[in-house]
Amino acid sequence: MRILHFSDAEYQQRMLRVKQRMQAQDIDVLIVTEPANINYLTGYDAWSFYTVQALLVFQDVDLPMWIGRSIDKQSAIVTTNLPDERIIPYPDIYVHSPDRHAAQFIAQMLLREAPRAKTVGVEMGAYYYTARDHAELQKALPNVAFKDAELLVNWVRFIKSEREIAYMREAGVITERMMKRAVEVAAPGVRQCDVAAAIYHAQMSGTENYGGLPATSPPHMGFGERAREPHPIFTDRRIDTNSVANIELSGCRLRYHAPMSRTVYFGRPPQSYRDLASYVIEAVETSLDAVRPGVTCEGIELAWRKSMSAHGIEKENRLGYSIGIAYTPTWGERTASIRRTDLTVLEPGAAFHLMGGLWLANTGITITQSFVVTATGHEPLTATPRELVVKD
């Protein structure tokens, strides 16, 4: 039995684009370690990335080679498009061993397949490519030159296919249901963790037609004074009256994400806070209006900045980031960012989370929108109204 969510033709096109980038950078072999990149190129999907796993992509060999822990071989057989002979497990003696390392095994397989390889690309900034991984590879491959291939595959992922966008739309529907339940359950006297429980239930149950998966991150929920924090975790404390809650969450459909943030006010917001919300909403709308092919990420940020500067407010952190397929710890793709100096040009199929969030000295507010760039503008991935939610 094979569980694949894309056609062989799509996987082949992805691999072709990766090899074209490898050729342009003079890379003979690419060692892919970022879980989202391995999934993108083969379909591999298991929670096994806490041990060493890699996909070896060869410039002169048609098929890549998956290498992972022996007990995870079955997951590779079930979830990838690779024939069994390209699924290579390493024995458990390499797992969490002080004197052995799976990089030694990976090096052996690389030399067996490409003995004349001169340059090897590695993802230096990937979360699951450690300093020891790199040091062990260097020791095991003393005659090759290592090149930093950080984000090589990530940039191939930047433009989504129609099937990918369809999965992101489905993730967006789950996101909407999660936020709806959060708003329904959250109220003064309710424990924060009970709001989280309702969110998780909506996240996993999904819709009548498809379910969800755990997102890369727990819901970031800042209640009361902690609304000033961008990435707080919920507690078992009860919600106060006349307080604010910032809730950031994302549905996940086959590892594809569509995040959203909303602010909930419990009680009657003072006019100053209503004004702040109106400024943020106006700036978000202005930024979305600027989205179209040919515009740069910096251009979108400029639209936000002009809108907010009219009210004397400056956002120091970035306004957004590219999204798509992702694994823990982040649903961001780590490529394009909506901010000053990012001259990435928007193209149809690129997807972003426009993060209209402000974390100020005495409060915070987050009203955001995930979207896909289209031929004429943008398509929102969620339909939840962009507004301050008031529960009086």
From Swiss-Prot:
Matching InterPro entries: Creatin/AminoP/Spt16_N, Creatinase/aminopeptidase-like, Creatinase_N, Pept_M24, Peptidase_M24B
Assigned keywords, A-Z: Hydrolase, Plasmid
Pfam family, any one: Creatinase_N
Uppermost EC category: hydrolase
EC number of the protein: 3.-.-.-
Gene Ontology MF annotations: hydrolase activity
Keyword set includes Hydrolase: yes
Protein family (similarity comment): Belongs to the peptidase M24 family.
PANTHER family: AMINOPEPTIDASE, XAA-PRO AMINOPEPTIDASE P-RELATED
Name assigned to this protein: Uncharacterized hydrolase/peptidase y4tM
Organism: Sinorhizobium fredii (strain NBRC 101917 / NGR234)
